C-alpha cells in the first residue's frame, strides 16, 4: 500500500490538540441544509461513543461536530454519519472486509467512482484508490478544511 501526502503552499500543519469546527462554517452549513431540507438525524454522544468502540477508532472533533449537528448530510459531498443506509460504521466495515490493511481510518464518503473518502487517526482526510495499487492520498488536513474547499452554496 502506497501512502502519498498532498503538499501545497497553503497546506497547514495541525497541532496535536483537537480543533473543533468553526462556528461560522457550522452556521453556513446549517443555513444551506435547512433551506434545502437536507439535514439528517443528528448523532447523540452515546451513538458516537458506540460507533467509535465498534470501529476501534476515535473520531476527529470536526467530524463529531458535523454529525452531532447534521447527521448524514451534504457538504460538497455526502458525509456519512450514523443514520441512513450508507453510514460510517457499515461503510468502514465493508472497506475493511475487502482491504483488511486499512485499520486506523473510518469511511465518511466516496468520490463517486467507488473510492472511499476516509479520515485517519490524525484527523486528515484521505482517499483510497482501490483500483490503483491500493494508493492512499491525503486530500485535506482536516474535515473542516475539506468542507471549506468543496462546499458550494447553491
Q: What are the residue ranges of the model-derived segments?
A:
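Segments surrounding the PLD/"HKD" phosphodiesterase catalytic module and close analogs
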Residues: 117-143
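N-terminal amphipathic/basic-hydrophobic helices that include classical n-h-c signal peptides
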Residues: 1-20
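A short, charged
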Residues: 140-154
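Intrinsic-disorder/low-complexity loop/linker signature
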Residues: 10-11, 84-86, 123
Amino acid at each position: 500500500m502506497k501512502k502519498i501526502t498532498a503538499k501545497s503552499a497553503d497546506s497547514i500543519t495541525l497541532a496535536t490538540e483537537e480543533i473543533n469546527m468553526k462556528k461560522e462554517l457550522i452556521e453556513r452549513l446549517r443555513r444551506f441544509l435547512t433551506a434545502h431540507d437536507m439535514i439528517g438525524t443528528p448523532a447523540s454522544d452515546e451513538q458516537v461513543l458506540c460507533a467509535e468502540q465498534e470501529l476501534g477508532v476515535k473520531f476527529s472533533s470536526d467530524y463529531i461536530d458535523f454529525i452531532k449537528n447534521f447527521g448524514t448530510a451534504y457538504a460538497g459531498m455526502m458525509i456519512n454519519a450514523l443514520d441512513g443506509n450508507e453510514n460510517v460504521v457499515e461503510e468502514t466495515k465493508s472497506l475493511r472486509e475487502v482491504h483488511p490493511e486499512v485499520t486506523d481510518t473510518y469511511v465518511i464518503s466516496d468520490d463517486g467512482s467507488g473510492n472511499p473518502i476516509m479520515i485517519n487517526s490524525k484527523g486528515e482526510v484521505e482517499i483510497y484508490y482501490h483500483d490503483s495499487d491500493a494508493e492512499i492520498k491525503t486530500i485535506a488536513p482536516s474535515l473542516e478544511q475539506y468542507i471549506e474547499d468543496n462546499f458550494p452554496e447553491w
